[in-house]
């Protein structure tokens, strides 16, 4: 009798009606399939920053997204910042953060803290988060393997703030081919051996170009490029390279968005297929961008 009851229950479960939620799940998987096939063994560089780094729930969503992208064969490179945590540690150590034109003034003492926080703490937290979701991440900075050579920005008025002088991706290619996820902090040495702090957006863009990446994705605290910075509904979903330059020239793109768009422009000019500025405050925004028809945020197109 018990066996008959179990069989009846099993039969009932098999014949259970398909719900709307079930249909949505199937639809999502079906929509994702061509993108999974398209981006298998392709390289995507992701700049991880903003609220997605500060909020624990968003952090976990990003780590899951990165693990999923890697598990279906996408070759992922993660570049990260960590400004808020740097400020917290400077405060703990009694060092007052100083900024000029939006950039941190980085003397030797401050640079020691920047390197400690970015490379020793934030980087390892990200590596651990990805590893906890079943993938193998490797923590690096620009110094490792001569990955990035820095050049002091401008006339040195910002101290040890640098820009990218050279990129050598030799250390990255074998890691990517073996399925590892390189996680890179934006600290690099200049030719004279001095550590420099480089804007993480800039590092991500230059790495994307050097790696011949399919996409550059910047996680931000904004929906994307807005025609009116105070109106989220003015989001520009797609824009060509020439149009992006015009928005900067006209002053529509300004302040914190300007260096991000400039980063996209430089990477596209060097052969990256597409650059995306997306809202990292939206859970699973990476998957929405890569694996759905509609995408999310702003796509800056380099071709056509």
Curated annotation (Swiss-Prot):
Q: Which SUPFAM superfamilies match?
A: Carbamate kinase-like (SSF53633)
What's the Enzyme Commission number for this chain? Answer: 2.7.2.8
**GO-annotated biological processes:** arginine biosynthetic process via ornithine; L-arginine biosynthetic process
Q: Where is this site: Transition state stabilizer?
A: 47, 260
Assigned keywords, A-Z:
Amino-acid biosynthesis, Arginine biosynthesis, ATP-binding, Cytoplasm, Kinase, Nucleotide-binding, Transferase
Identify the GO cellular component terms for this protein. Answer: cytoplasm
Q: Which molecular-function annotations from GO does this UniProt entry contain?
A: acetylglutamate kinase activity; ATP binding
**Its principal location?**
cytoplasm
Entry's localization field = Cytoplasm
The cross-references to Gene3D superfamilies, in alphabetical order and at most eight, read: Acetylglutamate kinase-like
**Pathway the protein takes part in:** Amino-acid biosynthesis; L-arginine biosynthesis; N(2)-acetyl-L-ornithine from L-glutamate: step 2/4
Catalytic reactions on record: N-acetyl-L-glutamate + ATP = N-acetyl-L-glutamyl 5-phosphate + ADP
Where, in this chain's numbering, is substrate bound?
Answer: 82-83, 104, 197
Q: Which InterPro entries does the entry link to?
A: AceGlu_kinase-like_sf (IPR036393), AcgluKinase_fam (IPR004662), ArgB (IPR037528), Asp/Glu/Uridylate_kinase (IPR001048), Glu/AcGlu_kinase (IPR001057), NAGK-C (IPR041727)
Kindly indicate where the leader peptide sits in this chain.
Answer: none
Q: Does the keyword Membrane apply?
A: no
Say which family it is in. Belongs to the acetylglutamate kinase family. ArgB subfamily.
Q: What does this protein do?
A: Catalyzes the ATP-dependent phosphorylation of N-acetyl-L-glutamate.
Looking up NCBIfam families in the UniProt record yields:
argB (TIGR00761)
Know the name of this protein?
Acetylglutamate kinase
